[in-house]
């Protein structure tokens, strides 16, 4: 009977009919879950979240070390040197990672380490001068992130076309200003601890105006990051591109945090 069943099955298939064995096989295939990105080695939202968490893990770990260096009287000088080295390293690696065709996890995590070195020391010094300011900056950053995510998901807020080009030009101009300001501070041309940001115009520190514009630019950049990540997932990009999404998101969040921290410091410094 087994032989007859097999033969009849072959004959049925040969004449375009479906045998009982084929029916069972098809039912199993239809019952199986459809292939998702993770099954095909494609980028998923979870991939981006995990890699972003890894980057912030590195930032926090390294930042804790440089925080202690910068806030300890015995090692504060070393802490400042590490902060400067971290800032330069983050700038260089940030540019390298931005222009690489393929994301490099090693270089991206190295960038996170440099950011941690800079952020830890900078945050520690600010916390010593203005207790509670770091928590305020963190909460402010999270609030902006939550608002922009809600605007993107619920209200359909997008930054594209002409608006995106204007934003990129504005960010380029801001980068040039920041580099010039940094050089003026390092060389001692400007004595104010905030550099050109400490200049007062009509009684208002220039740093507040520039900082507010920077926060708006960073917030809009978050929307662009969200859209870039969504496109990557929908197009089924390889998993390695989740590192690119995590890198872009981390860069924007760090920028946003620094700007909010600086604004708060300027405001509290005027008290």
Residue ranges and their predicted role:
Residues 1-271:
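A hydrophobic alpha-helical transmembrane-helix feature that marks the membrane cores
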């Amino acid at each position: 009977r087994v032989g007859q069943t097999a033969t009849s099955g072959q004959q049925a298939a040969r004449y375009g009919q479906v045998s009982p064995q084929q029916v069972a096989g098809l039912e199993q295939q239809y019952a199986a879950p459809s292939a998702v990105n993770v099954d095909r080695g494609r980028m998923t939202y979870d991939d981006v979240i995990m890699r972003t968490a890894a980057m912030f893990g590195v930032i926090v770990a390294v930042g804790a070390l440089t925080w202690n260096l910068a806030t300890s009287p015995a090692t504060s000088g070393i802490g400042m040197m590490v902060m400067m080295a971290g800032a330069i390293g983050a700038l260089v690696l940030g540019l390298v990672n931005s222009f690489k065709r393929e994301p490099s996890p090693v270089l991206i995590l190295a960038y996170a380490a440099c950011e941690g070195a800079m952020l830890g020391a900078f945050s520690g010094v600010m916390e010593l001068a203005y207790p509670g300011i770091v928590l305020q900056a963190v909460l402010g950053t999270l609030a902006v992130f939550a608002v922009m995510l809600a605007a993107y998901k619920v209200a359909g807020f997008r930054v594209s076309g002409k608006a995106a080009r204007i934003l990129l030009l504005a960010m380029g101009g801001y980068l040039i200003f920041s580099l010039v300001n940094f050089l003026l501070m390092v060389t001692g041309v400007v004595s104010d601890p905030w550099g050109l940001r400490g200049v007062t115009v009509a009684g208002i520190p220039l740093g507040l105006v520039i900082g507010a514009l920077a926060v708006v630019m960073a917030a809009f950049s978050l929307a662009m990051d969200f859209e870039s990540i969504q496109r990557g997932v929908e197009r089924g990009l390889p998993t390695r591109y989740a590192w690119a999404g995590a890198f872009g998101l981390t860069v924007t969040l760090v920028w946003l945090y620094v700007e909010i921290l600086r604004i708060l410091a300027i405001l509290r410094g005027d008290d």
